[in-house]
């Protein structure tokens, strides 16, 4: 620290009580964010009783005092975090209207400060000690705080030697700070509660979509945070995110994150804070830059992950209300979502638990009047619950409804389907037989004889159109071979029968190529178990362009393995006389095979 900067800091050192004396009745007072919340200053201000004072803040570590908490002031907030919810839950606070939520994208908040729509009289922040260049780093919370310090009439700051000095655009002039309050306390730490089984499964599904060399938004929420733990086998990841959290430390140490890390604030432990301290790899910028959709969209393979609370059957997403109460806020989700959609090979993901904490279905026919839409249905691409993944972009209303019902909680799927039929969202003959989670363990990548790779996965009801497309690519001979008679069309009901299975006594596998967002089915196998005999009837379809490459054998081997694993005694199939290719497939393997010929059809029985 230069002599001048040190002298300025010492000359302006005061007690917390003296520092907050600049606050006057009727003032608008900004409170610094997240783990850099200036607790000492907040406590000192709460000791006063100044009429008309409004505290303006984003995500704070602690506002109010006591247990249950109470406050002497009105709070105008851009995010309803844990401490604000605790205040709002106090009846006297709620009835007095002391907590007001402003639904706004966080990247737009600085504009309110600069244009005077939300005038700030005082900004209370926490900073690292001044540097020789006459500036102070805002440390781990730049977010909307920098804009507040530049717009406020007066800035008062806790100066904390434990606060990291961060790179990027995190600094404010010492001259902007009217008084310094020395504190020597550890920077507040925040670790997410351990992920439960539901969040863990959602995180696994999310991680499966992320490729090497992607740029990630971490975001607030347990699922985006847990997702990071499932990326240890990825390479050359970068981060452009509103917030970074504790798992980033491990990804950097493992060499998974090797690209730049740009963020606006950090929430974690001392491990994370030590990592970002004076390290140029980690650039902290104001939120209006980090959350600018144009900046986000300039990142190649940008992945945004938005944790939602509810979604309706057409794809409208709510992120601000949970079980009838304010929770979270608009925050940065919509901006990152739009930016990721504009990114080359980008991906925008919405994730949510299938049920709310109160036990209600999070996937609903309609959003409630207290569930505002944060992301419009036209902008929703990927939706993930613990029961699977749905892709909605470019899909019809009926296709969206079916895809979302498939990943709803099994106990409500029939009810949702009936409601969708009653509303006219889907046709009256729509089928949906799945009653379990999507069997992701059965998904695998395979290589054919010519070196081409494809993915083998269980079918979904939403594969109906793609299965019809496969049917119409078959030759007349192939159709007759598969269905044992000449068939010119595959109706919606027939296609649903092939795709909509219960994953228990019924199973079907699709061999798919192309991006996950718009896969093409090039082969399929079907399995229907008879509980009476313990035998499963099987059948196959292969795209003409993919025949003769071993795909039929791969699909058959997959069904054999599935049947054995699930206790079936064997398989049966009807094959047209002369279909030598399919006969060769059945003759392979360690099993007994009996053949009965009747009416030009060979009835095959394979016992394990």
Residue ranges and their predicted role:
Residues 1-431:
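Conserved alpha/beta enzyme-core scaffold
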Residues 426-442:
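Intrinsic disorder at enzyme termini
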Residues 437-608:
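Long, contiguous binding/interaction regions
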């Amino acid at each position: 620290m230069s002599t001048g900067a040190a002298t300025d800091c010492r000359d302006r050192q005061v007690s917390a009580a003296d520092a907050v004396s600049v606050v006057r009745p009727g003032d608008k007072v900004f409170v610094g964010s997240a783990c850099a919340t200036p607790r000492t200053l907040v406590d000192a201000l709460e000791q006063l009783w100044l009429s008309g004072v409004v505290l303006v803040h984003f995500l704070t570590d602690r506002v109010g005092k006591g247990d249950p908490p109470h406050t002497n002031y009105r709070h105008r907030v851009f995010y309803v975090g844990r401490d604000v919810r605790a205040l709002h839950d106090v009846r006297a606070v709620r009835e007095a209207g002391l907590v007001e939520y402003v639904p706004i994208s966080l990247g737009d908040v600085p504009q309110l400060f600069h244009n005077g729509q939300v005038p700030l009289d005082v900004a209370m922040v926490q900073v690292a000690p001044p540097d020789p260049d006459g500036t102070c780093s805002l440390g781990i919370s730049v977010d909307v705080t920098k804009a507040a310090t530049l717009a406020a009439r007066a800035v008062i700051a806790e100066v904390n030697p434990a606060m990291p000095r961060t790179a990027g655009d995190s600094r404010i002039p010492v001259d902007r700070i009217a008084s310094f309050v020395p504190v020597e306390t550890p920077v507040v730490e925040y670790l997410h509660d351990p992920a439960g089984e539901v969040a863990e499964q959602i995180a696994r599904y999310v991680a499966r979509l992320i490729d090497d060399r992607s740029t990630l938004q971490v975001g607030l929420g347990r699922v985006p945070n847990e997702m990071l733990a499932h990326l240890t086998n990825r390479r050359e990841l970068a981060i452009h995110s509103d917030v970074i959290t504790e798992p980033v430390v491990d990804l950097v140490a493992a060499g998974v994150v090797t690209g730049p890390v740009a963020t606006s604030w950090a929430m974690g432990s001392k491990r994370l804070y030590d990592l970002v301290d004076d390290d140029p790899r980690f650039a902290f910028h104001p939120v209006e830059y980090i959350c600018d959709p144009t900046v986000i969209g300039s990142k190649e393979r940008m992945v945004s992950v938005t944790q939602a609370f509810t979604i309706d059957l057409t794809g409208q997403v709510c992120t601000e209300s949970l079980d009838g109460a304010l929770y979270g806020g608009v925050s940065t989700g919509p901006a990152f979502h739009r930016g990721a959609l504009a990114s080359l090979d980008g991906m925008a993901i919405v994730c949510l638990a299938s049920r709310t904490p109160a036990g209600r279905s999070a996937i609903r026919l309609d959003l409630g009047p207290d569930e505002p839409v944060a992301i419009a249905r036209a902008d929703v691409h990927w939706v993930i619950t613990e029961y699977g993944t749905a892709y909605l972009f470019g899909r019809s209303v009926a296709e969206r409804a079916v895809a979302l019902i498939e990943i709803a909680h099994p106990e409500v799927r029939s009810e949702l389907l009936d409601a969708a039929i009653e509303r006219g969202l889907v046709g009256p003959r729509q089928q949906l037989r799945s009653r379990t989670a999507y069997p992701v363990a059965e998904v695998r990548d395979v290589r054919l004889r010519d070196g081409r790779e494809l993915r083998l996965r269980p079918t979904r009801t939403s594969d109906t159109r793609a299965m019809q497309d496969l049917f119409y690519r078959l030759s007349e001979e192939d159709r007759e071979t598969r269905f044992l008679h000449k068939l010119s069309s595959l109706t919606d009901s027939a296609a649903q029968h092939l795709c909509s299975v219960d994953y228990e006594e019924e199973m079907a596998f699709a061999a798919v190529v192309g991006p996950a967002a718009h896969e093409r089915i090039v082969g399929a196998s079907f399995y229907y178990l008879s509980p009476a005999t313990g035998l499963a009837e099987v059948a196959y379809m292969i795209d003409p362009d993919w025949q003769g490459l071993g795909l039929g054998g791969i699909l058959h081997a997959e069904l054999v393995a599935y049947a054995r694993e699930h206790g079936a005694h064997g398989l049966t199939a009807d094959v047209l006389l002369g279909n030598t290719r399919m006969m060769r497939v059945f003759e392979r393997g360690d099993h007994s095979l009996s053949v009965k010929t009747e009416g030009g059809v060979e009835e095959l029985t394979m016992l394990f």
